[in-house]
Amino acid sequence: MKNDQRRLRDRVAVFACIAIAAIAIDQLTKMWALSALADGRTIRVIPGLLSLTLVRNPGASLGMGSGMTWLISLLAMAACVALVVLAVRTISMKWTVLFAFAFAGAFGNLIDRVIYAEGFLNGKVVDFLNYGWSIGNVADIFLMLAGVAAVLLLFLGEPFSQKDLDEANGKTLGDDANATDDGAKAA
């Protein structure tokens, strides 16, 4: 039991450190964009691929949901709570890291929706990374990385819970008792 508590403590510490650092990076880059790009200028980083342009986005990714900012904010709050719960419940450090980045992305954009709100949770997200087909921010990158990592972890069969680990190892609840019976039958 002590080992489980230590692992939980370690996962919580990793989650907190990654989430705090990632949120800080997101917010610092947004502060920079608000000051450096406020005059409407565009900085070309990689011509044709990436430029820096300040946009205030009332919606979600790819401009969807611009009329439902309050709903997007409530969903982001629910997602943040769910990600913390998942991080505490998993036995996998890989899943913990994924949840920390997803939390940082959701919370980073939620901060904007609260800070820059003129009404109930209707603030606009600070976007400045212009890819030509979409404009986003560092929080969006964290969310995208978490999504890709989730697909990879699922594809690779990374166990989320002790039950998943036991199933991956071919164990079920009755396996310990059946192992002696099977061994006796085989002899």
Swiss-Prot record:
Membrane topology designation: Multi-pass membrane protein
Catalytic activity, reaction form: Release of signal peptides from bacterial membrane prolipoproteins. Hydrolyzes -Xaa-Yaa-Zaa-|-(S,diacylglyceryl)Cys-, in which Xaa is hydrophobic (preferably Leu), and Yaa (Ala or Ser) and Zaa (Gly or Ala) have small, neutral side chains
NCBIfam families named among the record's database cross-references: lspA (TIGR00077), PRK14771.1 (NF011353)
Active-site residue numbers: D127, D140
Transmembrane segments: 12-32, 68-88, 91-111, 141-161
UniProt GO cellular component terms: plasma membrane
GO molecular function, one term: aspartic-type endopeptidase activity
EC number: 3.4.23.36
Pathway linked to the protein: Protein modification; lipoprotein biosynthesis (signal peptide cleavage)
Keyword annotations of the record: Aspartyl protease, Cell membrane, Hydrolase, Membrane, Protease, Transmembrane, Transmembrane helix
Location relative to the cell: Cell membrane
Entry function: This protein specifically catalyzes the removal of signal peptides from prolipoproteins.
Family: Belongs to the peptidase A8 family.
The keyword S-adenosyl-L-methionine appears for this protein: no
An annotated GO BP: proteolysis
Organism: Bifidobacterium adolescentis (strain ATCC 15703 / DSM 20083 / NCTC 11814 / E194a)
Residue segments, region Disordered: 167-187
Taxon lineage: Bacteria, Bacillati, Actinomycetota, Actinomycetes, Bifidobacteriales
Protein name (Swiss-Prot/TrEMBL): Lipoprotein signal peptidase
